Amino acid sequence: MASATRLIQRLRNWASGHDLQGKLQLRYQEISKRTQPPPKLPVGPSHKLSNNYYCTRDGRRESVPPSIIMSSQKALVSGKPAESSAVAATEKKAVTPAPPIKRWELSSDQPYL
């Protein structure tokens, strides 16, 4: 591999003001350091760095259905029919995707068909 002579290296170092050959592998200053400081996490379910099991730091376990604070509709008590409804409860038939199939009638003039 070609390199400059010692005289040329010293001349370059003197002109630049620092040693250009000292750390060639770390020539970029924006590279992150190998030892990182510990993270500064906000206080929450995962603020502990150790003894923090996945099931306790999973945010989905903390979610609950919304609580109804106020409603304009009156809720029915389970097991009791509504007192104000005058219409008797009728059972609803199952919904079919098409009109009911008509039953075919056999012709009376040709009984073998």
Curated annotation (Swiss-Prot):
Record region (Disordered): 32-51
Topology relative to the membrane: Peripheral membrane protein
Cellular compartments annotated: Mitochondrion inner membrane
InterPro entries, per the entry: NDUA7
GO molecular function, one term: NADH dehydrogenase (ubiquinone) activity
Keywords from the named record: Acetylation, Electron transport, Membrane, Mitochondrion, Mitochondrion inner membrane, Phosphoprotein, Respiratory chain, Transport
Protein name per the record: NADH dehydrogenase [ubiquinone] 1 alpha subcomplex subunit 7
Species for this entry: Homo sapiens (Human)
Gene for this chain: NDUFA7
